[in-house]
């Protein structure tokens, strides 16, 4: 099995359910989990994940509470924090305190959707930041990625916001990017079926799935959410 990263929105429908999901996913041998930090203006996310953000915010979920929850669990897969820039730079105890806490928790990297590739080195965040590549990313920017320290590169396989799609476009471009970068290449945005995961595995190092899992969470009774998420991930992995 190649790489697989699941996106789980923290605090949807509540942090206790998030904790149970993270523990339940530990049995599947996946590469990692992106922990989504709720934000009031999630511009890169589609309606499914936007709803999860709004529910979590109404429930009073904060960055600090997310870190406390992560401190209560131990998992074998890699943890990544997916957050818009604002909650990071405006952390109440200061950005450096946040980064120190993330390091103690073993978080492998930050995924910041509203941080342009060229700005990564200018925001003064001393932590591995996952760069994004899209079908319209210029060649010189792809070369720039090789100068960035990061756990992997996140390829956005569709223009626009997150959400489930039927096809996997830009396969040729994904292959070209894969040939030119030194870091592992993971493809996300729109993957919802095992067949799509397999197509990604053929041309990249791993797949990232978000909206398909969040939809399962939205459609399931709260006490069944961890089990239903595990079942969906197994389906995506072909297990």
Curated annotation (Swiss-Prot):
One of its GO terms (cellular component) is cytosol. Gene3D superfamilies: Aldolase class I. The active site is at 34 (proton acceptor), 45 (proton acceptor). Pathway: Amino-acid biosynthesis; L-tryptophan biosynthesis; L-tryptophan from chorismate: step 5/5. The keyword Lyase applies. Keywords: Amino-acid biosynthesis, Aromatic amino acid biosynthesis, Lyase, Tryptophan biosynthesis. It catalyses: (1S,2R)-1-C-(indol-3-yl)glycerol 3-phosphate + L-serine = D-glyceraldehyde 3-phosphate + L-tryptophan + H2O. The keyword Signal does not apply. Its EC number is 4.2.1.20. GO terms for molecular function: tryptophan synthase activity. The alpha subunit is responsible for the aldol cleavage of indoleglycerol phosphate to indole and glyceraldehyde 3-phosphate. Tetramer of two alpha and two beta chains. Belongs to the TrpA family. This is Tryptophan synthase alpha chain. The lineage of its organism: Bacteria, Thermotogati, Thermotogota, Thermotogae, Thermotogales.
């Amino acid at each position: 099995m190649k790489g697989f990263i699941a996106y789980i929105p923290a605090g949807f429908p509540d942090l206790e359910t998030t904790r149970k999901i993270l523990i339940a996913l530990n049995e599947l041998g996946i590469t990692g989990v992106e922990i989504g930090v709720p934000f009031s203006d999630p511009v890169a996310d589609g309606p499914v994940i936007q709803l999860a953000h709004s529910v979590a915010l109404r429930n009073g979920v904060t960055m600090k509470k997310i870190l406390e929850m992560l401190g209560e669990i131990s998992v074998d897969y890699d943890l990544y924090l997916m957050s818009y820039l604002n909650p990071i730079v405006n952390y109440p105890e200061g950005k450096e305190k946040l980064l120190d806490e993330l390091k103690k928790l073993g978080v492998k990297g930050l995924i910041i959707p509203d941080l342009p590739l060229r700005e990564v080195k200018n925001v003064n965040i001393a932590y591995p930041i996952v760069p994004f590549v899209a079908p319209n990313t210029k060649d010189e920017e792809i070369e720039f990625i090789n100068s960035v320290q990061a756990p992997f590169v996140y390829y956005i396989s569709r223009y626009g916001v997150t959400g489930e799609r039927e096809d996997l476009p830009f396969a040729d471009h994904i292959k070209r990017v894969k040939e030119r970068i030194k870091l592992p290449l993971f493809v996300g945005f729109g993957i919802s079926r095992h067949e799509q995961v397999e197509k990604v595995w053929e041309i990249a190092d791993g797949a990232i799935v978000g909206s398909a899992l969040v939809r399962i969470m939205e459609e399931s009774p709260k006490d069944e959410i961890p089990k239903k998420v595990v079942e969906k991930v197994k389906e995506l992995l072909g297990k």
